Amino acid sequence: MKLRRLPNGDLEVTTRKGNIYRAVDLHNGWFNIWDEQREEVVVMIQYMDEFFETIAYREFHLN
């Protein structure tokens, strides 16, 4: 995964397959990736500078 900080503080997440998702900043070191089709949070990311940890939420994996 490749992460890029957006001007509004959110993250742009690019997967190995080239899919792009937006991770919303929760302002506590965590970011949610929202799946619009499922209407639910599918992944939570903890981001600190260039280090990040991805925690799968439910059984959805980003492609």
Protein language model regions, located:
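Short intrinsically disordered terminal tails
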Residues: 1-2, 59-63
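Negatively charged, low-complexity tracts enriched in Asp/Glu with abundant Ser/Thr
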Residues: 1-14
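Acidic, low-complexity, intrinsically disordered interaction modules
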Residues: 14-57
